[in-house]
């Protein structure tokens, strides 16, 4: 079956060939007039030898002038065959014609001289023809005034109806065509519930009668919500490849332009275009760029972004039931969106795309390795287990980094080692050369082993994956832990053990050297931040009590107010600070005491790390078990 015979494919209707936009017609006309002006100038300034008046008379006396044309201010004429080359030089190219200026004092001997030499004498009106004088005199002013009126009219048109010579008011929405789209729903994995919702909406657009018979009404809008990299835009691209209806896509930032009113004009134009081709889909990416809550204190009702938002609200609320135009939008900041956007009747349905769980990560990896030759030792289940917290975009980047590693090593297949190297590069950072002194290297080893001992023995801590003292990124060494399974709720005991692991490096330095270094700076920062949230946000302190004060939240600009007000007193703030300090000191004391009791394991593990630089989970267990057996012997 040929594409032209397939039903429902409106996007395959032949399109007319390219035409010159009407707004450029005036520019082409102006260019043509300018070229004609240059041609007229050129015709009046043909190549002629310029002679001094005395040279002209000498040429006449020598019989080298064939004819002349007398004018008020100049004399032009032509040479005989012998005279054309007499006056030629480097600055005067040879020419059969000449021109000379007449002196202001009349020469009574000129005409008798010309008659004696039998030179043909012609008379001529002075200056150019009248029509040339008229054109050359008025043409520059005509062009200038025409350009001024053109730009003035264009600006008025932009302000009133969104048009203009440069299409400022035209929508920047791009129409996706099925035959050019390379992404389908088969390329989207790990978000099956979202795919079902989207498939239902596409089916509604293609077969609305099936739903209308049951009294169902199509949603006006669908909002895709989720962290960056979870597949919102990918899902939209897949819809463009699957839908048998016109699909228009645009980024919300493309509505805003340097001219006032352009954003609202582009919104109107986009919806008008979609209505003409209904049923249709409109996809707006990064909706929060124009959909932030109004009245944020940055600009009033004249704010261009607010005008654009108001126009979107009007267009969506103005839909009729029979229009069959659906708005699909994506954002990773639903908290900043205006409440008018989120009410029923505009974005009726919200689809949440979260970071994938283990099975979903494995499904996503299988999609991304379709074109990647894998070695037999690659186990995608293990790769998925090790990539807790990775988004779909992170997993795609992981596969690509593994393929780059294999190509760098001149391998024909991507093996498990390539995935390990890629994982370390993404999580730990690129390996770098750092010239550490033996003392610094030993200090880094004890620091990382302090983390490792606490992670190994704390019952709620995440299992160890590796220890390395090879510098990665900005870190001199890394102790890596991987959760056994995805976590969605964190218990108080788990968080306490996590803080103890963070303080293990600093405590090990204090035990071995009697002082601490700056290497624990980030550990202290993260431990304090976590404990502040436990005390002030999650109510995990008996002294403060079950109060959710929002302390520790990362207050970003929410679009509604410049900063969150503090909902507790100065006295309570002092109590919270005191509680955080006392708990950190207690955790540090416990960690120092625990590592002191396991000093032999700490020394053995540090020696092994300094010798091998990197230890896997199995090697760590082997070293610690051997040290413990020697201690009990």
Swiss-Prot record:
Which residues does the record give as ATP binding sites?
226-233
What is the protein named? Answer: ATP-dependent zinc metalloprotease FtsH
Entry membrane topology: Multi-pass membrane protein
UniProt cross-references to Gene3D superfamilies, sorted A to Z: 1.10.8.60, 3.30.720.210, P-loop containing nucleotide triphosphate hydrolases (3.40.50.300), Peptidase M41 (1.20.58.760)
List the stretches on the Periplasmic face of the membrane: 41-133
> Which Gene Ontology terms describe the biological processes this protein takes part in?
protein catabolic process; proteolysis
The prosthetic group or cofactor this protein requires is:
Zn(2+)
| Biological role | Acts as a processive, ATP-dependent zinc metallopeptidase for both cytoplasmic and membrane proteins. Plays a role in the quality control of integral membrane proteins.
Stretches in topological domain Cytoplasmic: 1-19, 155-633
């Amino acid at each position: 079956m040929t594409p032209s015979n397939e039903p429902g494919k409106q996007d395959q209707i032949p399109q007319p060939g390219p035409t010159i936009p009407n707004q450029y017609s005036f520019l082409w006309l102006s260019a043509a007039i300018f070229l004609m002006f240059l041609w007229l100038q050129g015709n009046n300034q043909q190549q002629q030898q310029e002679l001094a008046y005395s040279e002209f008379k000498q040429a006449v006396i020598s019989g080298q002038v064939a004819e002349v044309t007398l004018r008020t201010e100049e004399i032009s004429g032509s040479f005989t065959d012998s005279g054309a080359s007499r006056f030629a030089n480097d600055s005067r190219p040879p020419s059969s014609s000449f021109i000379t200026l007449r002196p202001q004092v009349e020469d009574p001997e000129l005409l008798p001289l010309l008659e004696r030499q039998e030179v043909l004498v012609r008379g001529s009106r002075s200056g150019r023809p009248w029509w040339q004088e008229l054109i050359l005199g008025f043409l520059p002013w005509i062009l200038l005034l025409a350009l001024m009126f053109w730009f003035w009219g264009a600006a008025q048109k932009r302000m009133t109806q969104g048009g203009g010579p440069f299409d400022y008011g035209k929508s920047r929405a791009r129409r996706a065509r099925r035959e050019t789209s390379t992404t389908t729903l088969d390329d989207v994995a790990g978000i099956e519930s979202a795919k079902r919702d989207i498939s239902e909406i596409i089916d509604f657009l293609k077969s609305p009668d099936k739903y209308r018979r049951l009294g169902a009404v199509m949603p006006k809008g669908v909002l895709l919500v989720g962290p960056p990299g979870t597949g919102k835009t990918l899902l939209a691209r897949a819809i463009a490849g699957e839908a048998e209806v016109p699909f228009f896509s645009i980024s919300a930032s493309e509505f805003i332009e340097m001219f006032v009113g352009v954003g609202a004009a582009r919104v109107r134009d986009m919806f008008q275009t979609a209505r003409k081709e209904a049923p249709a889909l409109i996809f707006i990416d990064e909706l929060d760029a124009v959909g932030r809550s109004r009245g944020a204190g940055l600009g009033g009702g004249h704010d261009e972004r607010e005008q654009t938002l108001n126009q979107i609200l009007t267009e969506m609320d103005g839909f009729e039931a029979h229009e069959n135009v659906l708005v699909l939008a994506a954002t990773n900041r639903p908290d900043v969106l205006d409440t008018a956007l989120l009410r029923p009747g505009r974005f009726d349905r919200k689809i949440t795309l979260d970071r994938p769980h283990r099975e979903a990560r494995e499904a996503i990896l299988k999609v991304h390795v379709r074109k990647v030759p894998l070695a037999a030792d690659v186990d995608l289940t293990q790769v998925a287990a090790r990539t807790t917290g990775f988004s779909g975009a992170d997993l795609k980047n992981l596969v690509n980094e593994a393929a780059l590693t294999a190509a760098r090593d001149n391998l024909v297949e991507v093996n498990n080692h390539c995935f390990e190297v890629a994982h370390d590069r993404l999580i730990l950072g690129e390996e770098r050369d750092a010239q550490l002194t033996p003392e610094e290297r030993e200090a880094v080893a004890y620091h990382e082993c302090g983390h490792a001992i606490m992670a190994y023995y704390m019952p709620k801590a995440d299992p160890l994956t590796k220890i390395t003292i090879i510098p990665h990124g900005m870190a001199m060494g890394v102790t890596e832990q991987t959760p056994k399974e995805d976590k969605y709720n964190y218990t108080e005991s788990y968080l306490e053990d996590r803080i103890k692991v963070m303080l293990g490096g600093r405590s090990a330095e204090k035990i071995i050297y009697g002082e601490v270094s700056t290497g624990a700076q980030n550990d202290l920062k993260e431990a304090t931040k976590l404990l502040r949230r436990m005390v002030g946000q999650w109510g995990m302190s008996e002294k403060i009590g079950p109060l959710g004060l929002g302390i520790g939240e990362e207050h970003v600009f929410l679009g509604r107010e410049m900063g969150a007000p503090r909902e507790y007193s100065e006295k309570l703030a002092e109590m919270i600070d005191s509680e955080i300090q006392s708990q950190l000191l207690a955790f540090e004391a416990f960690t120092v005491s625990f590592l002191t009791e396991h000093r032999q394991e700490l020394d053995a593990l540090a020696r092994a790390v300094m010798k091998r630089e990197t230890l896997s989970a199995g090697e760590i267990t082997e070293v610690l078990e051997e040290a413990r057996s020697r201690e009990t012997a």
